[in-house]
Structure formats: C-alpha cells, structure tokens
Amino acid sequence: ADKLILPGVGAFPDAMKMLDEAGLTEVIKEQAKKKALMGICLGMQMLFDKSYEFGETEGLGLIPGTVELMHPANDLVIPHIGWNSLEKNEPCKLLESVNDGDYVYFVHSYAAVTDSKNVAAYCDYGMKVPALVMSGNVYGCQFHPEKSGKTGLGILKTFASL
C-alpha cells in the first residue's frame, strides 16, 4: 500500500495493546516515515505520545502531545456526539476542498492536547477541540470523515491523491 489509514473505535489502552500484540506498533512507525498516514477517531488519538484514558498509556508518538478527557464549558455533555463545524487553523492539503463552517461528524470523549502548529482545524464544543491534526505526512481526524458526507469524502479523496 502507498498510504495507511489507522481507524479506531474503542478505548486507547486496548487498541494500543492490540497493535503491540500484533507486532504492528513498530511497523506503523516505520511506514509513517515514508508513507502518508491518516488516523481516524481513536486512530488519530493513537498518533500522539500518550493518552490518559483509563490511566496512562503510551501512543505511537508520531505527533507531539497527549490525549485527555474533554472538559467542555456550558454544561455540554460528553461524549461529544453529532455534527460540528470546522474552523481552519493551519494550512493543510487535506482541507483544500473544505470551507470554514463545513460540518463533520464526531463521536468522542477525549481530545488531543498539542501545539497549535499541529492543528489544521478545530471545532468548538465548549472548548477548542483539535479536529484535524498533522505533522509532516501524518494526519489525524478526530471526526469520522467516512460519516461526514461531502466534506468527509472530499478529505478522503484528497488524502488518497497525496
């Protein structure tokens, strides 16, 4: 394959354990040095250094930062489930077909904590949530592009064309 997609639904510690047991952790790290990689939802979270979901678990370390429980303002509940709009932050090829205000679909309780330079787009859910992150040829969508209609398909098509 000339690109990799790391999907994920579930808990960070379990997912990392499964990658480790399958011998895939180092394979993914090595492949990410030479191929475009996209993490989706939990797959995005696993790109970071570590997560604090159910304790502390090391991630893949491909994007600097951590993953922490969200604390939204305005009594918003978690998990954050539903449609939310994107606000562009840093230039990113994956967002070429996306406009500020385009909606994508989220399902998550944890969010990345990383330097703003690694965030291509945020969403607002009572806090600024990194929605699309990047570092070199490694990208991550906290939202589900495959469930996000025209906007999500545009992002996936752009990734496929890299």
Tell where the protein language model's regions lie, with residue ranges.
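Cysteine-nucleophile active-site neighborhood
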Residues: 10-81
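Amide-donor transfer/coupling interface in amidating biosynthetic enzymes
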Residues: 66-162
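Short, Asp-centered acidic motifs that coordinate Mg2+ and/or phosphate
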Residues: 3
